[in-house]
Amino acid sequence: MKINNFIYIFLAAYLATFFRLTLNNNFFISIIGSFLVGFFVSKRLSYSNEKILFSGFFSCFTSFSGFIYFLYKILNQGDWIKFIIFFNLIIILNLLTMIFGFWISRKIT
């Protein structure tokens, strides 16, 4: 991988972090990120563009640790029912949103 690609990945990660801090809502960020991942997966990007977008932007924007921390806070309150509901809801909604993004991308191209 060329040095330029590393710079682009860094810039994409920086931009994603800025958006994540600006939005400041893990659930909303997760849904938007899943939709966009689904949308861009169908685009068949070049290897370097794929790395920039998925490794740089989306890995910082949709940070899995934000999702885990949210679930940890619920679990720490001892509310197992709420934990199970949110865990399943987040997984299912994100998967469906990604599929929807993929479908939309295919329909408009």
UniProtKB/Swiss-Prot annotation:
Compartments reported by the entry? Cell inner membrane
The cross-references to InterPro entries, in alphabetical order and at most eight, read: FluC
Keyword annotations for this protein, in alphabetical order, are: Cell inner membrane, Cell membrane, Ion channel, Ion transport, Membrane, Transmembrane, Transmembrane helix, Transport
Q: Provide a GO biological process annotation.
A: monoatomic ion transmembrane transport
Known catalytic reactions = fluoride(in) = fluoride(out)
Q: Which Pfam families match?
A: CRCB
Q: Where are the transmembrane segments?
A: 21-41, 52-72, 84-104
Does rRNA-binding show up as a keyword for this record?
Answer: no
- Classify the protein's membrane topology as the record does: Multi-pass membrane protein
Any one GO cellular component localisation term in the record: plasma membrane
Instruction: Tell me its family.
Output: Belongs to the fluoride channel Fluc/FEX (TC 1.A.43) family.
Physiological role = Fluoride-specific ion channel. Important for reducing fluoride concentration in the cell, thus reducing its toxicity.
Instruction: Report what the protein is called.
Output: Fluoride-specific ion channel FluC
Q: Which organism is it from?
A: Prochlorococcus marinus (strain MIT 9301)
Which gene holds the coding sequence for this protein?
fluC
